[in-house]
A protein has these predicted regions:
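Membrane-proximal periplasmic segments of bacterial cell-envelope enzymes
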Residues: 1-233, 315, 423-424
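Short, Φ-rich (hydrophobic/aromatic) sequence segments
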Residues: 61, 209, 221, 226-250, ...
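Beta-lactam-recognizing serine transpeptidase/beta-lactamase-like catalytic domain environment
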Residues: 72-74, 246-259, 296-342, 347-584, ...
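Solvent-exposed, polar/charged alpha-helical surfaces in well-ordered, non-transmembrane soluble domains
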Residues: 80, 91-95, 99, 135, ...
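Conserved, well-ordered alpha-helix/loop/beta-strand core segments that scaffold catalytic motifs
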Residues: 252-296
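Short, gly/Ser/Thr-rich active-site loops of penicillin-recognizing serine hydrolases
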Residues: 492, 591-621
Length: 621
């Protein structure tokens, strides 16, 4: 009985120890699992912490600039650049990535090695830029970025302990040192180290021909010249803001919430005709080069004051971002002040005829042999011209004859008329760059001022746009409309300013036709088209107040076509032309409006009138 009891005792004792051991093992395993779960939970919490809310800017798209027919003159193109970080680029993608980027695999690897050898403060560098979003390259790169591939890498990790070793290590029975081993680990991965950065790029389809008028942007996307600068806020719009949740691991974002809605920029439509603009630009460019002038400008108007062209040369191509010369973005038609010279003589005749001081007929002749003040006879041989009619005075552009007419007028009336023609007043087209010129008050005029005012010197100066506008009286029965540059804003409903009688402008217009047919403006004459206009030549005024004695001049031609019911008005200025010729010969001659600016007028107007594609739809017509 005792033996049996002893045997049963040890059996039970062994069973108890076995059960306790099993419970201990279960406890240890559960402890390990709990620790693992806590570790994973900590990782999840850490990842959740890395997913943060942040606000990002949503760029507004800049508005377009259009011509009168809707042709785009300035627009923002969606472009892309591809950035690469060679430190994390997987070798499994290199072959296809090189192909997508249009490199050979060897070229691409050499580029990567070159970048890796450089000590750089930034990880990513631009490998391709200025790419269309619709290009094959962008499509191929986007496919690679979303593709998952098997990527294997040799890694050194801790050798995994067996379960009973882990248990014994946990309960402190025996320590097992960490052993490092090499393993080849493979995972499915997306392409790393490649980013597509999208942006907008301003594009000017007509290049340099419109640059001084349209302007350009700086690297921050703000206008730094022309209309781009003047109306920067209107064109730029307002950026929006979105609140997004981001993951610091992948950089991905989700659940975007609009905080501030973006407002894209407004479009601006001009009265400019892009084709007429190009013809005027081409003509003025040719003239500047032909006559070795410092610069040249041309403005073309419709009868109702719409500006069809504002051309300046030299001018740069705004699509070329490598250079920026501010002088080549200068809209001289509005910025440069000039003394208009003999282009003012028609207005002296208009005023005198309108006031009944002259008849402007063939039997009315003015003495051009006697000096008046500081104005001396042009022709020393008195047998050539003892007197001149109004037509002859305009044809020969005679200063003394014009002064004879001005002597019949009082300076208050002259001032009032010049003011009604817009001289000395802002055109309010692009206010920040316009220099409106000066018209002195009549009490400041001396007798000499009044005389020189008759031929565009003395108490006044102006810009080319104001001069061109004054000639609109010949297309509006003596009235003068406001100039218009914008189709979709800055509308003015005011009546035209009445300056002269209808009969007066018709009479003098025919005399200006004679100037082109048989006078100083003969180089503006065109086969098949009637032209009327007036030349001008002015000594360059120095900053000191005097005039250049080196023969430097500014030359002009202002005119219109046809003579009855004119369709186009154009004013031309060449600044300091140095290479001119006598008549139609190759003999060098001093530069005048007749042998420089009149030629530019002819070239531009000929192209426009003979193109045959223009039937202008004028505002209000």
């Amino acid at each position: 009985m005792v033996a049996l009891k002893t045997q049963g005792y040890w059996t039970r004792n062994w069973l108890i120890w076995l059960i306790l051991s099993i419970l201990l093992i279960v406890f240890i395993v559960q402890s390990i699992n709990i620790h693992s779960i806590q570790t994973q939970k900590g990782s999840i919490i850490e990842k959740a912490g890395s997913q943060a809310l942040r606000q990002v800017s949503e760029k507004a798209i800049r508005g377009d600039i259009l011509d009168r027919n809707g042709e785009i003159l300035a627009t923002s193109l969606l472009r892309a650049k591809i950035n690469i970080d060679p430190t994390i680029l997987q070798k499994e993608f290199i072959s296809d990535l090189a192909k997508a980027l249009e490199f050979s695999e060897t070229e691409f690897k050499d580029l990567m090695d070159s970048q890796l050898s450089k000590k750089r403060g930034r990880r990513y560098w631009i490998i391709k830029d200025d790419i269309s979003l619709n290009s094959q390259m962008i499509g191929d790169i986007e496919s690679l970025i979303t593709d998952r591939r098997k990527v294997c890498a040799e890694m050194i990790v801790d050798k995994k302990l067996k379960l009973h070793h882990r248990i014994l290590s946990k309960i402190g029975v025996q320590e097992y040192p960490n052993e490092k081993i090499k393993v080849n680990r493979c995972t499915k991965q997306k392409l790393a180290g490649v980013k597509i950065e999208k942006y907008t790029q301003r594009y000017y389809p007509r290049g340099a021909s419109l640059a001084p008028l349209i302007g350009r942007l700086n690297s921050d996307g703000d206008g730094i010249a022309g209309i781009e600068q003047e109306f920067n806020d209107l064109l730029k719009g307002k950026d929006g803001e979105k609140e997004i949740s981001t993951s610091s691991d992948s950089g991905s974002y989700f659940n975007p919430k609009v905080v501030t809605k973006k407002q894209n920029g407004k479009n601006i439509q001009l009265t400019i005709d892009a084709n007429i603009q190009f013809m005027a630009y081409d003509a003025i460019k040719n003239s500047v080069k032909r006559h070795d002038a410092d610069s040249g400008s041309a403005i073309i108007l419709s009868p109702n004051g719409e500006i069809l062209s504002m051309a300046n040369y030299p001018a740069d191509n705004p699509n070329d971002k490598s250079t920026y010369i501010p002088e080549n973005y200068k809209n001289r038609i509005l910025t440069d002040l000039l003394e208009p010279g003999s282009t003012m003589k028609p207005f002296t005749m208009l005023l005198a005829l309108d006031q009944g001081k002259i008849t402007a007929t063939e039997d009315e002749c003015f003495d051009v042999t006697k000096r008046i003040g500081h104005v001396i006879p042009t022709y020393n041989d008195k047998k050539i011209y003892k007197c001149m009619t109004v037509k002859k005075i305009l044809q020969k552009s005679d200063n003394l004859g014009t002064v004879n007419v001005m002597e019949k007028l009082d300076k208050e009336t002259v001032y009032e008329t010049w003011s009604n023609l817009g001289f000395g007043k802002s055109l309010a087209l692009i206010p920040s760059i316009e220099t409106p010129g000066v018209l002195k008050l009549p009490y400041e005029w001396s007798n000499a001022d009044k005389r020189t005012a008759s031929f565009g010197y003395g108490p006044m100066n102006t810009n080319l746009a104001q001069l061109a506008r004054a000639y609109l009286v010949f297309g509006n029965e003596g009235s003068m409309p406001r100039l218009k540059l914008f189709q979709n804003f800055n509308k003015f409903d005011e009546d035209n300013v009445k300056v002269f009688k209808r009969e007066t402008v018709s009479n003098i217009a025919n005399h200006l036709k004679a100037v082109v047919e048989n006078g100083s403006g003969y180089r503006a004459k065109m086969r098949g088209h009637e032209v009327a206009g007036k030349t001008g030549t002015v000594d360059v005024r120095l900053a000191s107040g005097g005039y250049s004695k080196k023969g430097n001049v500014n030359t002009y031609f202002s005119g219109f076509s046809p003579v009855e019911n004119p369709k186009y008005f154009m004013s031309i200025n060449l600044n300091k032309p140095k290479k001119c010729f006598r008549g139609y010969t190759n003999k060098p001659f001093k530069c005048e409006g007749s042998n420089s600016a009149a030629i530019a007028f002819n070239e531009a107007m000929n192209k426009i009138l003979n193109n045959g594609n223009y039937d202008l739809q004028l505002a209000g017509n």
